[in-house]
């Protein structure tokens, strides 16, 4: 008898133990007695929303760095000006880009299993805010990549900053590999910048996300040192890869500071509201009390 009413309702809810017809007509089917399952569904949906926001920010930030960097490096950088034997335009082999993409996909998938907090109030999509935050992260990574490319190309000049720091001169193939490693690491570190509004250490990541990060960064570093695919790229030394790691970590902190500043400015001008999160311990007690309430 309830099936027609459930079908006409905006949100039809069938309780645990309802008939098959009622469950088929309902939009939501409670799988346990009481109202606690409704609370669980709301909290879970808000956590999914948070993970989707983090995914979008991370994906856009990585894409901005990758696409804009190769556009700028191909158009405005001419390696032949630094060494006549080098090509006129800077480029990285397709196999390197494919490797970055494949390893990055694993990190992206892990975002779906990250630790997040459900918000106290319902949230809605604001693509403008997501794009602004993504750009703050992605363009900072872009600037660091362009700066490293400029310094690496000038490594053959004894008077350059690179040489004055005591770093060795590099061949063109080594420069390609160094840039490959830098972009890879920047992308993987950006996942920690994208997942919080505050500093990246304000909320612990999930084991799955950390595991994906370790695998991706480890594989990228090994490939950079023992580059097996040829195509003009040459493996770099462990020392140089260590310097690249240090460079990326410093810029990752700068990225995070830029993100925190961006959110602060957006909150100050009223574009972003300060959202409180649900206390998981109090929620559990509340859900247990609702579990004792039977729904007729």
List where the protein language model places each region.
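Active-site-flanking alpha-helical
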Residues: 5, 112, 263
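Membrane-embedded transport module
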Residues: 9, 13-199, 226
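C-terminal transmembrane module of polytopic membrane proteins
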Residues: 62, 100, 153-296
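Acidic, divalent-metal-coordinating active-site segment for phosphoryl/phosphodiester hydrolysis
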Residues: 1-9
């Amino acid at each position: 008898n309830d099936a027609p009413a459930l079908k006409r309702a905006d949100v039809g809810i069938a309780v645990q133990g309802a008939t098959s017809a009622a469950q088929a007509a309902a939009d939501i089917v409670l799988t346990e007695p009481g109202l606690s399952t409704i609370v669980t569904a709301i909290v879970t949906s808000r956590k999914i929303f948070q993970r989707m926001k983090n995914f979008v920010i991370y994906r856009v930030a990585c894409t901005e760095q990758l696409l804009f960097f190769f556009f700028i490096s191909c158009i405005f950088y001419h390696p032949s000006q630094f060494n006549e034997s080098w090509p006129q335009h800077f480029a990285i082999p397709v196999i390197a880009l494919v490797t970055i993409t494949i390893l990055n996909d694993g990190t992206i998938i892990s975002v779906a299993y990250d630790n997040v907090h459900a918000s106290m109030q319902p949230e809605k999509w604001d693509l403008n805010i997501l794009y602004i935050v993504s750009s703050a992260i992605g363009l900072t990574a872009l600037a660091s990549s362009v700066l490293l490319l400029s310094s690496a190309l000038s490594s053959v000049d004894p008077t350059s900053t690179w040489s004055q720091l005591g770093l060795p001169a590099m061949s063109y193939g080594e420069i390609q590999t160094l840039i490959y490693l830098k972009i890879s690491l920047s992308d993987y570190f950006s996942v920690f910048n994208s997942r919080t509004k505050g500093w990246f250490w304000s909320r612990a990541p999930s084991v799955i996300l950390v595991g994906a990060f370790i695998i991706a960064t480890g594989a990228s570093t090994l490939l950079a040192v023992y580059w097996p695919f040829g195509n003009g790229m040459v493996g770099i030394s462990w020392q140089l890869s260590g310097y690249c790691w240090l460079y990326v970590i410093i810029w990752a902190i700068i990225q995070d500071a830029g993100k925190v500043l961006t959110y602060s400015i957006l909150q100050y001008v009223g574009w972003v509201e300060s959202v409180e999160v649900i206390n998981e311990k109090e929620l559990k007690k509340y859900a247990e009390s609702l579990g004792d309430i039977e729904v007729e």
